[in-house]
């Protein structure tokens, strides 16, 4: 299994949730997305009105799975508007003590979340998603002026999707894209807990490289690394055509299994490569993801026993599920 004796591995402590370290020392942290676009529990995505009972059941489901396996959780909220993201943030903060990943397709929405978090004393629980090559000045300023010290740092290089290109955008920047590396920007923002996202792209568009760069980040930077591998099969043309064919043949269950196995499998590959955290997609998938990642974590501990790696926390899958 993978082990990095030549590079000290950073461990980020985000409100008691530890992310990083040598493979096998700490369990993989898992985050399912809630309030995503089209989420059936959301009644008004602009105002942030949602079925609170259903949402709480989903959050508590993740907490229960975390307790049962030893794999900690982070809440991952998506917001379509400033009003919505603030409402989601306040509500989730009351329901769980977990760190909260703040996410949106709009920069101003994330900025509003950070500013609000600072006002109400939640900034240290926020994980900003993300510092990337398109990060706007208002985002940088908002993070600087807050107590938010955790962020996902994206290794997406639109000019070079190779391992070298992704590492370069992190450490140096890229001509025509960013004069500074993402880690330098992260430092300037006061980020003490950088979580590298290898930028998983759809299958056929450099997805394999996103998996491979996991190893480079651990070996060369020693930083916590992960991402959203469920993006890999999300735009897989062959799978889409195959599922369509199965449905036309009346094999609906086969089609559903084909989709689910590809989605879950993308996360298992990442976990096997010793990712430190996973954004596994819709929160409803939690019961399928948690046990298999716990199994992988326990196997990694067994594989690394001969190099002296041991779990650094009592609540580790290796101490619970095997």
Swiss-Prot record:
The keyword Ligase does not apply. It comes from Methanopyrus kandleri (strain AV19 / DSM 6324 / JCM 9639 / NBRC 100938). This is Tetrahydromethanopterin S-methyltransferase subunit H. Pfam families: MtrH. It catalyses: 5-methyl-5,6,7,8-tetrahydromethanopterin + coenzyme M + 2 Na(+)(in) = 5,6,7,8-tetrahydromethanopterin + methyl-coenzyme M + 2 Na(+)(out). It is an enzyme of class 7 (translocase). Part of a complex that catalyzes the formation of methyl-coenzyme M and tetrahydromethanopterin from coenzyme M and methyl-tetrahydromethanopterin. This is an energy-conserving, sodium-ion translocating step. MtrH catalyzes the transfer of the methyl group from methyl-tetrahydromethanopterin to the corrinoid prosthetic group of MtrA. Pathway: One-carbon metabolism; methanogenesis from CO(2); methyl-coenzyme M from 5,10-methylene-5,6,7,8-tetrahydromethanopterin: step 2/2. GO terms for molecular function: tetrahydromethanopterin S-methyltransferase activity. The lineage of its organism: Archaea, Methanobacteriati, Methanobacteriota, Methanomada group, Methanopyri. Its EC number is 7.2.1.4. The complex is composed of 8 subunits; MtrA, MtrB, MtrC, MtrD, MtrE, MtrF, MtrG and MtrH. InterPro entries: Dihydropteroate_synth-like_sf, MeTrfase_MtrH/MtxH, MtrH.
């Amino acid at each position: 299994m993978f082990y990095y004796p030549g590079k000290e591995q950073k461990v980020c402590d985000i409100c008691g949730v530890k992310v990083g370290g040598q493979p096998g020392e700490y369990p993989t942290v898992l985050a399912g997305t809630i309030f995503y676009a089209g989420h059936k529990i959301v009644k008004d995505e602009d105002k942030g009105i949602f079925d609170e009972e259903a949402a709480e059941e989903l959050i508590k489901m993740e907490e229960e799975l975390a307790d049962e396996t030893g794999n900690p959780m982070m809440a991952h909220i998506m917001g379509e508007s400033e009003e919505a993201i603030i409402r989601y943030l306040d509500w989730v903060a009351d329901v769980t003590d977990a760190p909260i990943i703040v996410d949106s397709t709009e920069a101003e929405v994330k900025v509003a979340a950070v500013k609000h978090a600072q006002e109400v004393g939640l900034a240290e629980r926020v994980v900003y998603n993300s510092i990337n090559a398109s990060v706007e000045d208002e985002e940088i300023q908002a993070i600087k002026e807050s107590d938010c010290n955790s962020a996902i740092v994206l290794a997406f290089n639109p000019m070079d999707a190779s391992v070298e290109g992704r590492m370069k955008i992190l450490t140096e920047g890229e001509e025509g894209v960013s004069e500074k590396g993402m880690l330098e920007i992260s430092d300037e923002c006061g980020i003490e807990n950088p979580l590298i996202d290898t930028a998983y792209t759809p299958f056929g568009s450099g997805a394999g490289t996103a998996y491979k760069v996991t190893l480079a980040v651990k070996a060369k930077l020693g930083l916590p690394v992960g991402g959203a591998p469920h993006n890999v099969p999300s735009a897989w043309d062959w799978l889409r055509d195959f599922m369509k064919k199965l449905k036309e043949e009346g094999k609906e269950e086969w089609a559903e299994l084909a989709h689910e196995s590809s989605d879950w499998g993308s996360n298992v590959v990442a976990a096997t490569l010793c990712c430190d955290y996973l954004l596994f997609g819709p929160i409803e998938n939690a019961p399928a993801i948690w046990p298999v990642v716990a199994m992988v974590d326990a196997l990694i501990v067994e594989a690394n026993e001969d190099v002296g790696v041991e779990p650094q926390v009592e609540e580790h899958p290796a101490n619970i599920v095997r």
